[in-house]
Amino acid sequence: MKVIEKIQEAAADGRTVFSFEYFPPKTEEGLDNLFERMDRMVAHGPNFCDITWGAGGSTADLTLEIANRMQNMVCVETMMHLTCTNMPVEKIDDALTTIKSNGIQNVLALRGDPPHGQDKFVQVAGGFACALDLVQHIRAKYGDYFGITVAGYPEAHPDAIQSTEGATPEAYSNDLAYLKQKVDAGADLIITQLFYDTDIFLKFVNDCRQIGITCPIVPGIMPINNYKGFLRMTGFCKTKIPAEITAALEPIKDNEEAVKAYGIHLGTEMCKKILATGIKTLHLYTLNMEKSALGILMNLGLIEESKISRSLPWRPPTNVFRVKEDVRPIFWANRPKSYISRTLGWDQYPHGRWGDSRNPSYGALTDYQFTRPRGRGKKLQEEWAVPVKSVEDINERFMNFCQGKLTSSPWSELDGLQPETKIIDDQLVKINQKGFLTINSQPAVNGERSDSTSVGWGGPGGYVYQKAYLEFFCSKEKLDQLIEKSKAFPSLTYIAVNKDGESFSNIPTNAVNAVTWGVFPGKEIVQPTVVDSASFMVWKDEAFEIWSKGWACLFPEGDSSREILDKVQKSYFLVSLVDNDYINGDLFAAFKEI
């Protein structure tokens, strides 16, 4: 979806929205850290996020890779910067074609900084001289597909500022006229360069309106994180620093925490003044850090740390090809990125109902599904590379996770227990102690308010429902006992399968069971998660593979722990268990005498 359309929707609803900017890190570790941070920040619901192109066009390939992952794995509406620096038109078209094929619809068109080693911008052979040329090219070749954003400079472009007094009236006027040319050529949104004098920004907005620029103008807010970085950035951008800011920073400039605290306070006050004028969109330059940006938003009341709203139980996709998707099998609830990667390229995505899962084919398992960020890999190494001498040791690892003693699991891309799991964590601990090793679960919910902090989704005003669900590994002996006990509980349905495909079930092979649904004003029933027998047989390969590629691999070759884990992998069954009585049922009753 185009960012301009999202901004217009928010304006029509009277909502204030915000967005974040990131830049490509220089190291693989930095990239892993960025995506972990981005996942946390995106949970707060930014309107979009953008990724920079890099000084002198130095990060072109990395920017394309990051933009793709942001749009399709992080599931946030993504705007990619695109500059003219070192970019002949063929390269520009390659970049645009790539992001279009990846479902990205938003571009920030810039001239770009001078190439490395040069003081002034140099037009590359076969390339463009300015952002206006780039905007014209995008509109001419790609029509209305892309939403195009351009940069606005409240104090004029740095190249137009020749003295410490700022741009001359003529230079400022010329810069505004050029901005209007970019908008007239097809840009539909303006994001400003950083500023610290709010009055300068508000004057800039008014001046734009006076010359006929009518599109939204979004203020770019850069929190002050450290004193030296602040001086470097404002010097590079030739940004005016009000005397009161200089006076406030001088006595604390060597105290980094005090500078950050002041930066949050200053950013908050700037945003309050801007919002008071009726502007409803804020863009935060994060510098790949989260605390200051989130601190400002919390101070403004735009986010709450303890209350993160969800439009669905899983983060909805933003890729233009799958934006209507609203139904998924529950099996990948803790591995959403793996699910996305295995369903890329489907011609259609389920909307309204799951339908026939045998129609689209899931992608084959690859190393991608088992790679993990360095930080998560390190945490798994610390928490799960504990010697395994018996099956009881395995049970203890799973119990510790359910008790919150561990914050990672080989079967989850998420951090720790999810809020709804904590409702049933005592029962989960008990069945894990008995050898039913849980990897996915949800409690029964009967008409809980949709804004509940533990089980809510879909926004305020609705009610949500869930059938109790468990997914676990267990031995054949335990499975036989459970199947026998379940005969006394007619509301229980199950599917069980081992690594080799031997299976047991009390439901048809093509059965689809909605296990989560919501009722909202003026809408049809929404049922975002299902138990689908056919998809479970696809998921089981991935679930069993994690025993070796997610856990056993943490131990050295030849380690006895690997042997025990291998035996469990080859002999245990994966079980999906649903209690269809979400009003009076008790999913855990069948386990009590086992």
Curated annotation (Swiss-Prot):
Active site, renumbered: E21 (proton donor/acceptor)
Keyword hit for Metal-binding: no
EC number: 1.5.1.54
Gene Ontology MF term list: FAD binding; methylenetetrahydrofolate reductase (NAD(P)H) activity; methylenetetrahydrofolate reductase (NADH) activity
Residues annotated for FAD binding in this entry: T52, W53, H81, R111, G112, D113, Y153, H157, P158, D159, A160, D175, K182
Annotated S-S bridges: none
Protein name, as recorded: Probable methylenetetrahydrofolate reductase (NADH)
Species this chain originates from: Oryza sativa subsp. japonica (Rice)
